[in-house]
């Protein structure tokens, strides 16, 4: 099965490509490399023995996408491409709507022309906004998002939903991720953010490896057990397996399919700091800072629907998430860049 993977050089996309190859699928990667490095292709080949086809370009470039579809017999699409930092989205909303919303619309148009009507969309738990009740189920209210990143994901969900209701031969799967962390257990691949990390785990890892002085913990006065934000952290390998489960089960069935991908358990920022200190064998210095705009107090998933319909469940523990992150960061202190 040939699958176009937009953003396939990024953190989640690259790990998913490895798992796809292991499952006998053939990923065709499209990425503009705005938040990724070419070295990822070599790492995928090192892990799988195969280097996937790669086309450098932007999903907002319709002629480019049309040419990729014409060159390959693609049966489905996994759409990861997009900007993903909550804080940056507050400062740069237009860039987020342009990349995430317009890019998705251009992709859908190109798919329709090519007769490819199966898409798995990389959505986010941010579409739920600040939830009144946790755990969050797939029918929890959406749309009251607290930042432009979340709004862009919600808008794309609405666009794809409208597309399905207009043309119900599409298979559209919306995967709402919670908080992806971890790395390939080999230490060969992991998260390599450009510039200052926006997400907790790579920031902790860079502090532990000596690239940064200390971790900034944003918000210590939330109504949570230790005052710091609580999130559902999911290992990127479990997340990758969730995409393959979606392609295999509902990817060939027309419909609008929506699933949470999380563990069903919440962990606080300070709990993750402690777990990482255990993994790397030394304390991680941090300071408590004011809340960030757009952040919420707590958020974790109800995972029963994915377990029931996809036969998928996250199995890796917080200890594995932190150990694999440290293994990646200690082996690759500068990420994919040479020292």
Set out the residue ranges of the language-model regions.
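C-terminal substrate-binding subdomain of Rossmann-fold SDR/epimerase-dehydratase oxidoreductases
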Residues: 200-339
């Amino acid at each position: 099965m040939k699958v176009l993977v937009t953003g396939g050089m990024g953190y989640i996309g690259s790990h998913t490509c490895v798992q796809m190859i292991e499952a006998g699928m053939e990923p065709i990667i499209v990425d503009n490399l705005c938040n990724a490095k070419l070295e990822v292709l070599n790492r995928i080949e090192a892990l799988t023995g195969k280097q996937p086809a790669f086309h450098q370009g932007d999903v907002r470039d319709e002629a480019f996408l049309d040419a990729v579809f014409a060159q390959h017999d693609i049966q489905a699409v996994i759409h990861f491409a997009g900007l993903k930092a909550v804080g940056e989205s507050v400062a740069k909303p237009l860039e987020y709507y342009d990349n995430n919303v317009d890019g998705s619309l251009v992709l859908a148009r190109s798919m329709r022309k090519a007769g490819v009507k199966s898409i798995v969309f990389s959505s986010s738990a941010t579409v739920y906004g600040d939830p009144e009740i946790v755990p969050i189920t797939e029918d929890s209210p959406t749309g009251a998002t607290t930042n432009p990143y979340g709004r862009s994901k919600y808008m794309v969900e609405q666009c794809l939903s409208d597309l399905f209701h207009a043309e119900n031969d599409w298979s559209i799967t919306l995967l709402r991720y919670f908080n992806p962390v971890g790395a390939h257990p080999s230490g060969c691949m992991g998260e390599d953010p450009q510039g200052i990390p926006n997400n907790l785990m790579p920031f902790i890892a860079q502090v532990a490896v000596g690239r940064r002085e200390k971790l900034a913990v944003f918000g210590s006065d939330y109504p949570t057990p230790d005052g710091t934000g609580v999130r559902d952290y999911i290992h990127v390998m479990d997340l990758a397996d969730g995409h393959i489960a979606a392609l295999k089960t509902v990817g060939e069935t027309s419909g609008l399919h929506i699933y949470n991908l999380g563990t069903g358990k919440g962990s606080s920022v300070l709990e993750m700091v402690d777990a990482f200190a255990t993994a790397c064998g030394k304390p991680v210095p941090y300071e408590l800072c004011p809340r960030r705009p757009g952040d919420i107090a707590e958020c974790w998933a109800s995972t029963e629907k994915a377990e029931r319909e996809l036969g998928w469940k996250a199995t890796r523990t917080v200890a594995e998430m932190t150990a694999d992150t440290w293994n990646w960061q200690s082996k690759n202190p500068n990420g994919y860049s040479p020292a």
